[in-house]
């Protein structure tokens, strides 16, 4: 037979003991808080005496860290989703607004106000621009679709093909200081534009050759320059490749002939990468000066 008091003592001894724990956690010293926890465990329990105490503590720490990582990851995902959703909403609203705007504007737009469609330029035109200056023809000019022109230093000759049997009275030819306009009456001008350089209108002439070619003679104002084109806007020639007719040099006065010969010489020198007449003259002067002053050291001197 059991006594009631003994039963109560047995039941009370089987219950776990609860001890209050008081400590303050400082964010600056979290390890201090843990030290107090372990001190408390050592004083109030036999947990630290267990051989597996350290392993159990490590497992608990790892579990806490894993739990923290999961919580942070979940929070980061929520924060990243919100801006994306908002951005997507804004994009959808914009697209809807644009569509509504287009639908409402369509009936009121006039055909003339439609945006012009850009037409792709032919490859030939692009190639011409990229290719740069063209090689001159045998007359140091250019053969174009509607006319051709040749030149020497004093004059430019323009030849314009016209229907066979064309009479002079049907030709319209206006030669001004800086402009040339040529064509047939009642038709659009064949040539109409600003000249590359000015001419002397009083010394310019035109005539019909064999009733099928309008030939125009333009006398240059500056008779020491090669023209790159006859009318501005037309393809330009490479004046470095101009070849003057040597047979005509004898017709020039001595001064002009000397200048032309100098220009021809300089042009050939440049094409070969050699010094021009002016550069050669400077070199001769420098050599003479150096020979007259042997006492001076020019080894480190730089010459332009």
UniProtKB/Swiss-Prot annotation:
It is found in: Cytoplasm; Cytoplasmic granule. Residues 142-231 form the CS domain. Residues 111-141 are annotated as: Disordered. Expressed in all seedling tissues with highest expression levels at the root tip. Induction: Up-regulated by heat shock. It holds the Pfam family CS. Residues 54-106 form a coiled coil. Changing residue 141 to E: In bob1-3; general growth defects and reduced fertility, but no effect on the in vitro chaperone activity. The keyword Metal-binding does not apply. The modification N-acetylalanine is found at residue 2. Residues 118-131 have a biased composition (Basic and acidic residues). GO terms for biological process: developmental process; embryonic pattern specification; flower structural organization; heat acclimation; inflorescence meristem growth; leaf morphogenesis; pollen development; protein folding. GO terms for cellular component: cytoplasm. Keywords: Acetylation, Chaperone, Coiled coil, Cytoplasm, Developmental protein. Disruption phenotype: Embryo lethal. It comes from the Eukaryota. InterPro entries: CS_dom, HSP20-like_chaperone, NudC_fam. Small heat shock protein required for the establishment of auxin gradients and for patterning of the apical domain of the embryo. Involved in the specification of the cotyledon primordia. Also required for normal inflorescence and floral meristem function, normal developmental patterning and thermotolerance. Acts as a molecular chaperone. This is Protein BOBBER 1. It comes from Arabidopsis thaliana (Mouse-ear cress).
């Amino acid at each position: 037979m059991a006594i009631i008091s003994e039963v109560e003592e047995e039941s009370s001894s089987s219950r776990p003991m609860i001890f209050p724990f008081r400590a303050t956690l400082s964010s600056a010293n979290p390890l201090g808080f843990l030290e107090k926890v372990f001190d408390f465990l050592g004083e109030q329990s036999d947990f630290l005496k267990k051989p597996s105490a350290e392993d159990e503590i490590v497992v608990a720490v790892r579990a806490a860290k894993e739990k923290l990582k999961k919580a942070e990851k979940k929070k980061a995902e929520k924060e990243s989703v919100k801006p994306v959703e908002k951005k997507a909403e804004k994009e959808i609203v914009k697209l809807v607004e644009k569509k509504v705007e287009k639908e409402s504007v369509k009936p009121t737009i006039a055909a003339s106000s439609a945006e012009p469609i850009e037409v792709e330029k032919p490859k030939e035109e692009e190639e011409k621009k990229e290719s740069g200056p063209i090689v001159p023809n045998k007359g140091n000019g250019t053969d174009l679709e509607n006319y051709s022109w040749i030149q020497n230093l004093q004059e430019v000759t323009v030849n314009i093909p016209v229907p066979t049997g064309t009479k002079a009275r049907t030709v319209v030819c206006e030669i001004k200081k800086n402009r040339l306009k040529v064509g047939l009456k009642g038709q659009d001008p064949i040539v109409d534009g600003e000249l590359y350089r000015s001419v002397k209108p009083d010394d310019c002439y035109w005539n019909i050759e064999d009733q099928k070619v309008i030939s125009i003679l333009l006398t240059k104002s500056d008779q020491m320059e090669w023209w790159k084109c006859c009318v501005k806007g037309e393809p330009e020639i490479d004046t470095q490749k101009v070849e003057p007719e040597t047979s005509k040099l004898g017709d020039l006065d001595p001064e002009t002939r000397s200048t032309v010969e100098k220009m021809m010489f300089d042009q050939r020198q440049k094409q070969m990468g050699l010094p021009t007449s002016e550069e050669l003259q400077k070199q001769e002067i420098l050599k003479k000066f150096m020979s007259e002053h042997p006492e001076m050291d020019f080894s480190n001197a730089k010459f332009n």
